[in-house]
A protein has these predicted regions:
Chain B
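Positively charged n-region of N-terminal signal peptides that target proteins for export
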Residues: 1-7, 11-12
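Extracytosolic ligand-binding ectodomains
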Residues: 2-4, 23-400
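In a subset of proteins, long, contiguous C-terminal domains/tails are tracked
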Residues: 11-14, 399-400
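C-terminal motif of bacterial Sec signal peptides marking the signal peptidase cleavage site
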Residues: 18-21
Length: 292, 400
C-alpha cells in the first residue's frame, strides 16, 4: 500500500506542480503572487470542456484552443487590472489584493455561464495501467508526468534560450534599466501572463482528465496548495515548482496513510508555514529577493 | 502620494468585489423578474386577484457551489405555483414564488431570514434552506417570528425540533441510514463495510449514525472495517480508497452527494472493480449518471421519489418538469415541489395565510404528492416509504 500511496502522491503532486509553474513564472518577473491563477486554471479546464464536449472540436484542437484562450485571459487580466496599477506606481500589496478579486470574478462568471455543477470530463489516456512492484501506475499518471516535464523543458528553453526570454530575465533584474535598453516591459509582462495562462490551461485539462471531473471552483483549493508548492520549491524557480509539487502531493498521500484523511488538507499549509519560518527562500529560491 | 495610491487601489478592489457580487445577484434577480411577469400574464387570463398575491419564498443557493440544488428548488416551486395559478390560484389569489439566494452559507441565510421575517405580512412561508447546517442557523429566526419553514432537504436529526414552525419534507437521516445499511447487508449480502464521509456537519453526523447501526448488527457478523473522512470537493479520494481497500471492505457506504459518489465510484473501481457502493437519496440526480459514467453502474441507494414510477401523477409531473427545464427532476427538487403544494393546500384549507393557523393545519394535513403520502409528525418530520434504486446500464432502476 505504501508504494500505491506514493504513486497516487506523485500524480497528485504533478498536478500541483503544473499549477505552481504559473505562480513561479509571474512571480519571477513581477514579484507578484498572482492569486487569480487558480481560477485561470479552472477557466482553462472549463473552456476545454466547452470546446471538446459541447462543440465537438476533437481533443487536440480543443486543448490547443483552450490554451490559446486561457493565455488571452491571462493577458486580459494583466491589461485590465494590473497594468493600470503599475502605471500608477501602486504598492505591490494593491496588485496582490486585486488578483484575489479577479479570482472571484472569473470563478463567478464561470458559474453564471456554465453552472456550478460538477461535470464529467473525458479521460484521454484510458484506464489501462502498468503493475509495478505491487502497485498500479495508470497510463494517465505516466502521461501527466511526461507532459509536465515536456512543458517545463519548453518553458526553461523559452526563458533561457530565446530573445523574449532574455527580455524577461532583463525585466526581472531591473525593469527600469530594461526599459532604457529598449525593452517593452509591458509587452514582456503580458507575454509572461500568456505563458502562465497556457500552462494553467494545460494543467487544468490534464487534472480534469485524470479525475474526470470539472467545475468552476476547482481552482480554489488546488490553487492554494500549488502556491504552497511554489513557495516550498522557491517561488520564481521552475524546477523548484515541480519538486515542490511532488513533495506536497506525496506529503498529502502519506498524511492520509499515517494520520487519516482528516489531516490531508492541512498538510500542504503546515509545510507552507514551516518553509516560511525555516527556509523562506524555498529549496531553489535565490537569496535576497524582497518578498511581497 | 503613496497613501493616495493605496487608497485608489483599495477603492478599485472594492469596486471589483462589488461588481462580482452584483453580477451574481443580478442573475438571480432577472430570473425572479421573468418569473413574476410570466405568472402575471397567467393571472390576467384566469381573472385571479394578482394585486394581493400569496408569496412563497424559496431560499436556497442560486449561485455558487450548490446552485444546481437551489435552482432545482426554485424550478420545482414555480411549476407547482403555475399548477395552482392555472386552477384559479390559492384562495383566489395568485401564487408567486420569490427567490432568495443564500449561497448555501449560514451568514447569508441569516440575513435572508431576517429580510423574510421583516416582510412576513406578505410572505406565507419559506421553502428552504438547502443544507442542514444552513437550515439550522436560519430556523430559530423563523421560529421566533412565527414564519413557517419547510426544508425539502435538511436531514439532520436536530433540525425539526428547533420549533413548531419548522418542518422538513425529507426523511431524517437515521431512518434513511437504516435503509442504506439494509441494502448493503441484506440485499447485497456484504459483511465487511467501509464508510467514506464528507467533513460537514451532515456528513460527520450521518457517518456516526451508520456506525451505530453497524455496531448493533455485530451479532450477524457485520463489521465496520474502516471509516475515512474526506473534504467535500477535494476530487482526489485515491488515498482514502487505498486505505479502505487495504482494510478489506466489501461494500462502501458513501455519505455525500453525487459529487462524492461519482468520483469515489470511479477511483475505487480502478483499484477494486467488485466493490459495492451504497449512497443516500441526495445522490439521486441525473448528474450522478453524467459525472459517473460506467463507474456508477451498480451503485444502490434508497429514495422516496423515483422518477420512472408507474404512477400517473408522477409521470405527469416528470413530463411537465422535463418539458419546462430540459431534465428530469431530482429527488430533492421533487420534495421542494411537494413542500410548496403542502403549504398552499394548508393555506387553502384554513382560508387564511395566518401562520399560526396554517402551521396547525400542516400538522393535520395528509398530502398525497409525487414523493408519496406525507404526514408531519409532532416534531415536523415525515416518515415515508423507501424505494430501493440501483443503476443499471446508465439508468436508474428499482432493485429486485
Amino acid at each position: 500500500m505504501l508504494l500505491q500511496q506514493i504513486f497516487n502522491g506523485l500524480a497528485l503532486g504533478m498536478g500541483y506542480a503544473l499549477i505552481a509553474v504559473g505562480y513561479s513564472l509571474v512571480f519571477g518577473i513581477l514579484r507578484l503572487v498572482n492569486f487569480s491563477h487558480g481560477s485561470v486554471y479552472a477557466f482553462g479546464a472549463e473552456i476545454a470542456m466547452v470546446f471538446i464536449v459541447s462543440m465537438r472540436l476533437g481533443i487536440i484542437p480543443g486543448i490547443l484552443l483552450s490554451m490559446l484562450f486561457t493565455g488571452i485571459l491571462g493577458i486580459l487580466i494583466d491589461k485590465a487590472a494590473l497594468e493600470p496599477l503599475r502605471k500608477k506606481g501602486s504598492p505591490p500589496i494593491a496588485s496582490l489584493i486585486t488578483t484575489i478579486g479577479i479570482s472571484n470574478i472569473v470563478t463567478n462568471l464561470l458559474i453564471i455561464f456554465l453552472g456550478s455543477e460538477k461535470r464529467n470530463f473525458p479521460n484521454f489516456f484510458g484506464h489501462s495501467g502498468i503493475h509495478l512492484l505491487g502497485g498500479t501506475v495508470s497510463m494517465t499518471q505516466i502521461m501527466m508526468c511526461v507532459i509536465s516535464v515536456i512543458l517545463m523543458l519548453i518553458l526553461v528553453f523559452i526563458v533561457f534560450r530565446t530573445k523574449i526570454g532574455l527580455a524577461m530575465r532583463a525585466s526581472q533584474q531591473n525593469a527600469k534599466a530594461a526599459r532604457m535598453m529598449g525593452i517593452d516591459v509591458n509587452f514582456v509582462i503580458r507575454f509572461t501572463f500568456f505563458l502562465a495562462g497556457v500552462s494553467a490551461a494545460l494543467a487544468g485539462v490534464l487534472i480534469a482528465g485524470y479525475y474526470e471531473i470539472v467545475y468552476p471552483n476547482m481552482g480554489f483549493m488546488a490553487g492554494l496548495k500549488a502556491f504552497s508548492a511554489a513557495v516550498l520549491g522557491g517561488i520564481g524557480s521552475l524546477p523548484g515548482a515541480i519538486l515542490g509539487g511532488l513533495i506536497i502531493g506525496n506529503a498529502e498521500s502519506m498524511a492520509v496513510m499515517f494520520l487519516g484523511s482528516t489531516y490531508r488538507d492541512s498538510v500542504a499549509f503546515i509545510i507552507l508555514i514551516l518553509v516560511l519560518i525555516l527556509r523562506p527562500n524555498g529549496l531553489f529560491g535565490r537569496k535576497g529577493i524582497t518578498k511581497v | 502620494m503613496k497613501r493616495n495610491a493605496m487608497a485608489v487601489s483599495m477603492l478599485l478592489l472594492a469596486a471589483m468585489l462589488f461588481n462580482a457580487a452584483c453580477s451574481a445577484g443580478s442573475g438571480a434577480g432577472t430570473t425572479a423578474a421573468k418569473n413574476e411577469s410570466g405568472s402575471q400574464s397567467a393571472a390576467e387570463n384566469s381573472g385571479m386577484d394578482s394585486a394581493h398575491p400569496i408569496k412563497v419564498a424559496v431560499a436556497a443557493p442560486m449561485t455558487g457551489d450548490n446552485s444546481e440544488y437551489g435552482i432545482g428548488f426554485a424550478n420545482a416551486a414555480k411549476l407547482m405555483a403555475k399548477k395552482w395559478n392555472e386552477n384559479g390560484g390559492c384562495l383566489g389569489r395568485e401564487v408567486q414564488i420569490v427567490e432568495y439566494d443564500d449561497k448555501n452559507s449560514s451568514e447569508e441565510a441569516t440575513t435572508i431570514a431576517q429580510k423574510i421575517v421583516s416582510e412576513k405580512d406578505e410572505i406565507a412561508g419559506v421553502i428552504g434552506h438547502f443544507s442542514s447546517g444552513v437550515c439550522m442557523t436560519a430556523a430559530p429566526i423563523y421560529e421566533e417570528n412565527h414564519v413557517i419553514e419547510i426544508s425539502p432537504s435538511a436531514s439532520h436529526p436536530d433540525y425539526s425540533s428547533i420549533g413548531d414552525y419548522i418542518f422538513r419534507n425529507n426523511t431524517v437521516i437515521s431512518k434513511e441510514g437504516g435503509a442504506s445499511v439494509d441494502i448493503a447487508v441484506n440485499d447485497l449480502g456484504k459483511k465487511k463495510i467501509g464508510i467514506i464521509s464528507i467533513m460537514t456537519d451532515w456528513g460527520t453526523n450521518t457517518s456516526g449514525i451508520i456506525k451505530g447501526i453497524l455496531e448493533g448488527m455485530k451479532d450477524k457478523g457485520v463489521e465496520l472495517v474502516a471509516h475515512e473522512e474526506v473534504m467535500e470537493g477535494s476530487d482526489d479520494y485515491s488515498a482514502a480508497i487505498a486505505k479502505l481497500n487495504d482494510a478489506g471492505a466489501e461494500a462502501v457506504i458513501c455519505c455525500g452527494m453525487y459529487n462524492l459518489v461519482a468520483p469515489v465510484a470511479k477511483q475505487y473501481k480502478r483499484v477494486n472493480p467488485d466493490i459495492a457502493i451504497i449512497a443516500f437519496s441526495n445522490a439521486y440526480s441525473t448528474q450522478l449518471l453524467e459525472l459517473g459514467g460506467d463507474a456508477v453502474n451498480g451503485v444502490c441507494f434508497p429514495v422516496i421519489f423515483f422518477a420512472d414510477s408507474e404512477e400517473q401523477s408522477i409521470k405527469d409531473y416528470v413530463d411537465a418538469y422535463t418539458k419546462a427545464y430540459g431534465a428530469a427532476p431530482s429527488a430533492l427538487s421533487s420534495q421542494a415541489y411537494d413542500s410548496v403544494g403542502m403549504l398552499l393546500t394548508a393555506i387553502q384549507n384554513v382560508g387564511d395565510t395566518d401562520s399560526e393557523k396554517v402551521k396547525d393545519e400542516l400538522y393535520k394535513l395528509d398530502y398525497h404528492g409525487v414523493t408519496g403520502d406525507t404526514r408531519f409528525d409532532k416534531t415536523g418530520d415525515v416518515d415515508k416509504a423507501f424505494v430501493k434504486v440501483t443503476i443499471k446500464d446508465g439508468k436508474f432502476v428499482k432493485m429486485d
